[in-house]
Structure formats: C-alpha cells, structure tokens
A protein has these predicted regions:
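Conserved beta-strand hairpin/beta-sheet module of binuclear metal-dependent hydrolase folds
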Residues: 1-24, 94-104, 110
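Generic anion/oxyanion-binding catalytic loop in active/binding sites
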Residues: 3, 33, 114
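Hydrophobic residues in well-ordered beta-strands that form the structural core
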Residues: 4, 52-54, 103, 144
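Divalent metal-coordination and catalytic microenvironments
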Residues: 5, 32, 44, 67, ...
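Short, conserved glycine- and acidic-residue-centered signature motifs
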Residues: 7, 37, 118, 122
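Active-site HxH/HxHxD metal-binding segment of metal-dependent hydrolases
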Residues: 8-84, 161, 165
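Metallo-beta-lactamase
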Residues: 79, 89-170
C-alpha cells in the first residue's frame, strides 16, 4: 500500500485500515512540507518500517528517498511519475499515476494552494499549474492533499472550467 500526505492525528486510523485490509504499507509520500498540519510520515515509518519519500527540494532529513522531476516511483505493479510543481511551496511535488494526479496543495478543488508563506511563489505556481498540471488530459482525476469544502476528487477538465483561481490570462 501507499499513503500520500498522511496526517499525524490519523496514523492510528491508517494502521487500522491497513490491518483490516491485510495490506503492508510499502511507501509513504509527502508532496511538500506542510504548514497546516503535522505529517504522519515519521510515525508511519517508525511503526511499519515503510520507505518514506519526498521531492529532492524538500528540506527534510526524515525521508529515505528523494525523487527528481519526471522520476518514476515503483510500488509493486504501480508506477507514479514525480512532477515538480513549485509555487505553494518551493518543494511541492505532484504525483501522476495513470489517469489520476495527486497534487498536494498545488491544485485544490476549485482552488490552489496559498503562495504567501513557506517559500511560496505566485509565478512558480502559475507555471506549475498552466505549464504542467493543466496540460494533463482533461479526464485526469485530481486528488489534492485535502479540501476545506469536503470534496475529495475532481478532474483537470472540471478545474479548468470551474476553478475561479484558474480564470486568469497571464501570470500577472
């Protein structure tokens, strides 16, 4: 099994679900250093001996693996492609798996991650969104790290059409 962007307060729930489904946690990925919650990555590593992973720009020393842009991560018969998508933070990565993308906070449902703290940069965010994520096929499912409105999945096409933060004509 793989968990992306785990929250510390939910590690017991993750472990319970893994046990109920008789799964072994192989890897845990954080898409970026989070300011809004404490990552469950170290706790899951300690409790399951899984491999921990972040992008190469992450200033974290708790991970066993750092990936580069366009690098493929293999988990059993599943491949994820790392996509460097800075802007929300300078260490933000998204992960593409077939017809779905896990965007961390780079692209939220009908929103985008803030760029006013944690080495965020609005121009980098614009480039990550318009030159990377929104170039994916419109039917690609979007799974952000969290959503403040209770939604947990969208598509690139829906975001292009309905996301108010994407209704801009330039990076200005």
């Amino acid at each position: 099994a793989l968990i992306i962007d785990p929250v510390l307060e939910k590690t017991d729930q993750y472990i319970l679900l893994l046990n109920q489904l008789d799964l072994r946690l192989v890897k845990v990925i954080d898409t970026h250093i989070h300011a809004d919650h404490i990552s469950g990555l170290p706790e899951l590593r300690d409790r399951t001996k899984c491999i921990t992973l972040m992008g190469e720009h992450a200033p974290a020393d708790i991970v066993s693996m750092k990936v580069k842009d366009n690098e493929t991560i293999k988990i059993e018969n599943v491949n994820l492609t790392a996509m460097y998508t800075p802007g929300h933070t300078n260490d933000s990565y998204s992960f593409l798996m077939n017809d779905r993308v896990f965007t961390g906070d780079a692209l939220l449902i009908k929103g985008t991650g803030r760029t006013d703290f944690q080495n965020g940069n609005s121009y980098d965010s614009y480039k990550s969104l318009f030159d990377r994520l929104l170039k994916l096929p419109e039917e690609t499912y979007v799974y952000p790290a969290h959503d403040y409105k209770g939604e947990n999945v969208s598509t690139i096409g829906e975001e292009i059409k309905y996301n108010p933060r994407l209704q801009v004509s330039s990076a200005q």
